Amino acid sequence: TGYLRDTAVTATAMDLDDQTAGNYVAKWEASFNFDHKQVMTLLDQINYLGAHNATTAGEIAQSVNSAASMGQIAGVDPAATAAMATAMQATGVATDRVGTSISRIYTNLSKGSNATKAQKEMWEELGFTAEGIAKSMQTDGVGTLKEVFTALQDMPDERKVAALSTLFGQWAIEGGAKITNNLGAYEKALAMVSDPSLYTGSMEREFIIQASTSESIDTMVKNSVTALKQDIGT
């Protein structure tokens, strides 16, 4: 079936085990309220990011699996979450901390009137209000993120750590600092997921290169069937 082949393509292109690939293909529809085609587009975007940055598609997918649902609530689509994960991983943030960092950033940007007194004061120091940022995230999440990180980048160096700590919390300081100091890497990754001419067919191309024999395709499809059966409990 299409699902089985798509799982095989995903596993091969991203160098994932079949069960992990099957989980992404099957479960991201419910997680992100996507149809199957949207899931495969997101996986193409992630695969392209992994091929063109100092990280891997598998690591990016792991962070997306962890943080993208929170991103959607905060006003950021999963592809943009993938771009942020890419920028953090490519600048040295450990993969197992990236998802948490991104989730904390999204949560803190969305607090609005629930922000702490210290956060409200820090937002004002940056030229924003906590309520304004929360509203802005809902209308243009990516634009708001870029605006916030640019403002942080423009702060005097001696204020940056305090600002990152106050606004994002200790668990997200490193990730926030990496984006602030490497805004170009984040913008480059965003540009990649915004251009269908770059990422469309990314996994299929990789799959064709690796699965050049009918024997290897048969093996991959059999493995995918096994993984899917385990996943749905048959």
Put a short name on every predicted segment.
Residues 53-54, 71-74:
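Short coil/turn linkers that connect adjacent helices within long alpha-helical scaffolds
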